[in-house]
Every structure is written in C-alpha cells, then in structure tokens.
C-alpha cells in the first residue's frame, strides 16, 4: 500500500514538472544581409551579447551555431528595424508629428 502511494505521488510530481515550462521567448537576430549571425563558441560569449545588444536586448548566447537573443521581439529581428526602433538620433529618425 505504501509503495503504491509513493509511486502515485512520484508520478504526479513528475508530471507537474513537465507541464511547467521554463522556456524563455526569443529569436535569432538577422544581419544586414538577412542571414542569422553564425557563432563558433557555443553557450555564453561576448560576440552574441554584442549582437543582441545591437538588436535592443540585453542578453544572448550561441545556440545551434547561431546567436540567440532572449526576449527579442519579432519587430526587432531585422537589423535595420531594430536600429530604427532603438536609435535615439533625432536627425536620422525625426520624431513623428
């Protein structure tokens, strides 16, 4: 009886762990030429962090040999769109009236 109860509780706890996802939304940023940025050092590295900062987010890393940026929205995936959305230079991008 105790073994059956233990197994039931163990299975329930295991299933609840599967239903809770820790996946962080993000995207692969695109370069000027419409390509994903390649990276050689998997995991956290300075190159991908710089790429992600240029696209308007603070954190990124090398995943599947491409830079992955956490919380990168669809509107900022393209380099020029991200530049326009985050550039503070009023001469390049005058404020809309």
Curated annotation (Swiss-Prot):
One of its GO terms (molecular function) is toxin activity. Residues 25-88 form the LCN-type CS-alpha/beta domain. The keyword Iron-sulfur does not apply. Residues 1-21 form the signal peptide. GO terms for cellular component: extracellular region. The keyword Cytoplasm does not apply. Disulfide bonds join 39-62, 48-67, 52-69. PROSITE patterns: LCN_CSAB (PS51863). Expressed by the venom gland. Gene3D superfamilies: Knottin, scorpion toxin-like. It is found in: Secreted. SUPFAM superfamilies: Scorpion toxin-like. Keywords: Disulfide bond, G-protein coupled receptor impairing toxin, Ion channel impairing toxin, Neurotoxin, Potassium channel impairing toxin, Secreted, Signal, Toxin, Voltage-gated potassium channel impairing toxin, Voltage-gated sodium channel impairing toxin. It comes from the Eukaryota. Belongs to the long (3 C-C) scorpion toxin superfamily. Monomer (edited version) and heterodimer (non-edited version) of this alpha chain and a beta chain (AC P0CI43). The heterodimer non-edited LVP1 induces lipolysis in rat adipocytes. Induction of lipolysis by LVP1 appears to be mediated through the beta-2 adrenergic receptor pathway (ADRB2). Has the structural arrangement of an alpha-helix connected to antiparallel beta-sheets by disulfide bonds (CS-alpha/beta). This is Lipolysis-activating peptide 1-alpha chain.
């Amino acid at each position: 009886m105790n073994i059956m109860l233990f197994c039931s509780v163990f299975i329930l706890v295991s299933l609840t762990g599967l239903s809770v996802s820790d996946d962080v939304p993000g995207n692969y940023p695109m370069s000027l030429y419409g390509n994903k940025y390649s990276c050689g050092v998997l995991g956290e590295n300075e190159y991908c962090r710089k790429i992600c900062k240029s696209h308007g987010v603070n954190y990124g890393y090398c995943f599947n040999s491409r830079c992955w940026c956490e919380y990168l929205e669809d509107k900022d995936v393209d380099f020029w769109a991200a530049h326009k959305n985050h550039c503070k230079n009023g001469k390049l991008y005058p404020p809309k009236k």
